[in-house]
Structure formats: C-alpha cells, structure tokens
C-alpha cells in the first residue's frame, strides 16, 4: 500500500470514530498527478448529495499544460448500504473527512474516509499535553 497523500489536520482537529474505504472517480490527468504524489487534502471534506458522496476542495496538481480545474468535486464510490450508514451518522453532528489517499494492492486509488467529531480548543490542548507526557514516559523507560 503506497500512500499518496494524508490529511494531517484531520487527526489534529477531529476525534476519529469510524473509517471507511472508498474508490474515487478520476480522469486520466488526475491519475497521473496521483502517481506523482501531487495531491493535497489540507482543506478537503466530503458531502452527500442525492445519495452520492463527493470529495470537495481536494487539490490535484495540473499535469503538463492542461487547462483543467484542480479543485473540482470528485465522486467517491461506495455501496448504497455504506452511504446510508454514513448518512445516519451525519445526522448525529459528525463530520465526514478524507484522511488519506493511497494505492491498494491492485494498484487502484482508494480514499480512506473517517467519521469524526470536531475538537474544541481545550480538547486539543488536553490532547497535546497527554501526548507530551507519553513521550516523556517513553524516554524515561528507555533509559
């Protein structure tokens, strides 16, 4: 499994509860830029429209000198049952966030989606403090 792009902000800003694997519908130039690892998920998010899931605000760098839209909506391929499950979870004020794009074992491009709850500032601070304490404990236990 070769990872193309990860969304570092997702783990920092959300408490991840569930993950899903989805295919993605891409054009030829988008696949070429993905193979070159020229993809960003910084501000990306997912939404459901008419029982279809779309990846929005993801950036695929232009390949060569094509006149194309780099941040268009891209359709994600999921089973109907999975889409209905996600829809039910979104009713509970959860967010659907793309966490990474990767090639699976069959060289197909997949997107890992996560259902998460947004963290507030004080939650983020607590999380950072816990991580620092764990790092210090690991250092102490090594010696």
UniProtKB/Swiss-Prot annotation:
Alphabetical list of PROSITE patterns matching this protein: SSRP (PS01317)
Keywords per UniProt: Cytoplasm, RNA-binding
A GO cellular-component term linked to this record: cytosol
SUPFAM superfamilies: Small protein B (SmpB)
A Pfam family it matches: SmpB
Chief localization: cytoplasm
Listed GO biological process terms: trans-translation
Superkingdom of origin organism: Bacteria
Cross-referenced CDD domains: SmpB (cd09294)
Coiled-coil residue windows: none
Molecular function terms from GO: RNA binding
Localization terms from the record: Cytoplasm
InterPro entries found in the cross-reference section: SmpB, SsrA-bd_prot, SsrA-bd_prot_CS
PANTHER family, sorted: SSRA-BINDING PROTEIN (PTHR30308:SF2), TMRNA-BINDING COMPONENT OF TRANS-TRANSLATION TAGGING COMPLEX (PTHR30308)
Protein family: Belongs to the SmpB family.
Function: Required for rescue of stalled ribosomes mediated by trans-translation. Binds to transfer-messenger RNA (tmRNA), required for stable association of tmRNA with ribosomes. tmRNA and SmpB together mimic tRNA shape, replacing the anticodon stem-loop with SmpB. tmRNA is encoded by the ssrA gene; the 2 termini fold to resemble tRNA(Ala) and it encodes a 'tag peptide', a short internal open reading frame. During trans-translation Ala-aminoacylated tmRNA acts like a tRNA, entering the A-site of stalled ribosomes, displacing the stalled mRNA.
Name of the molecule in the record: SsrA-binding protein
Record organism: Mycoplasmopsis synoviae (strain 53) (Mycoplasma synoviae)
């Amino acid at each position: 499994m070769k990872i193309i792009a990860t969304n570092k902000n997702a783990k920092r800003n959300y408490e991840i509860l569930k993950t899903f694997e989805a295919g993605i519908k891409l054009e030829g130039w988008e696949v070429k830029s993905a193979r070159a690892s020229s993809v960003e998920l910084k501000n990306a998010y997912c939404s459901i429209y008419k029982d279809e899931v779309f990846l929005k605000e993801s950036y695929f760098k232009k390949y060569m000198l094509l006149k194309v839209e780099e941040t268009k909506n891209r359709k994600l391929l999921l089973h109907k049952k999975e889409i209905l499950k996600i829809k039910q979870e979104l009713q509970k004020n959860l967010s659907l966030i793309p966490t990474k794009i990767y090639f699976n074992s069959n060289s197909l491009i997949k997107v890992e989606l996560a259902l998460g709850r947004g963290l507030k500032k004080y939650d983020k601070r607590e999380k950072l403090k816990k991580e620092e304490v764990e790092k210090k404990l690991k250092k102490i236990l090594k010696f």
